[in-house]
A protein has these predicted regions:
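NAD(P)-dependent short-chain dehydrogenase/reductase
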Residues: 1-31, 37-38, 44
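Mid/C-terminal beta-alpha module of Rossmann-like enzyme folds, strongest
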Residues: 42, 49-94, 99, 127
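Short, surface-exposed alpha-helical segments at coil->helix boundaries
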Residues: 6-10, 67, 71, 102
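Residue-level signal for alpha-helix termini/capping positions
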Residues: 16-17, 47-51, 131
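Non-catalytic, hydrophobic alpha-helical segments
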Residues: 39, 43, 58, 69, ...
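Residues at secondary-structure transition points
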Residues: 3, 7, 30, 34, ...
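C-terminal amphipathic/interface module of NAD(P)-dependent oxidoreductases
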Residues: 64, 99-135
């Protein structure tokens, strides 16, 4: 997710417009929520070191289901929105989604680069910048 959207973060905030008393969000698919800013910062560090070659998976630290991600978005935005967990089967998508999209970051660890930020911290930074004039 990044500035200007579209993204899951933007979609959740837009859906919490007061017209839906309850949202259902998938709770059985897990990943590493990662901001574009966190990836850009890590990429900048990699580019400073020409000896670092190969494929790098860059994700923020930690993991969450889409449901947990949505709850964190609303909590940090101070939005009172009821969010119920649901199974993937209850939320059909045009293309199947994996239950586990977490990425292994072994190349980053082996490179000696500092770890990327925790996903909750990166989300907080993003929300503070992207929605600074909202309230």
């Amino acid at each position: 997710y990044g500035a200007g959207g579209p993204s899951f973060v933007h979609a959740m905030i837009n859906l919490a417009d007061g017209t839906r008393p309850t949202l259902k969000v998938v709770s059985d698919q897990f990943g590493n929520p990662t901001s574009a800013l966190a990836v850009a910062r890590e990429l900048r560090e990699i580019l400073k070191r020409p000896e670092l070659v190969g494929t790098y998976h860059m994700t923020c630290e930690g993991e969450a289901s889409w449901h947990e991600f949505a709850l964190e978005i609303f909590e940090r935005m101070g939005i009172s929105q009821k969010v119920l967990p649901c199974a993937t089967e209850e939320f059909p998508r045009p293309a199947p989604r994996p239950a586990n999209s977490r990425l292994e970051k072994m190349m980053l660890l082996l490179s000696g680069l500092p770890p990327m930020p925790d996903w909750k911290d990166a989300l907080g930074e993003f929300l503070a910048k992207e929605f600074k004039n909202r309230k």
